[in-house]
């Protein structure tokens, strides 16, 4: 789970540097959040099965 959290922080940092235009920033952040959420959900489902 630490790796996912670290990836999220890095992605946010990158989004701030790359997506400087106001139109791109929310779209990029939304994609990152959805991607991170999906990964977290997968991890939780794997834990539940054990």
UniProtKB/Swiss-Prot annotation:
Disulphide bridges: 33-40
Top-level lineage group: Eukaryota
Name this polypeptide is given: U-megalopygitoxin(9)-Mo13
Localization in the cell: Secreted
Signal peptide feature range: 1-23
Recorded family membership: Belongs to the caterpillar 9 family.
UniProtKB keywords: Cleavage on pair of basic residues, Disulfide bond, Secreted, Signal, Toxin
Residue ranges the record marks as coiled coil: none
Predominant location: secreted
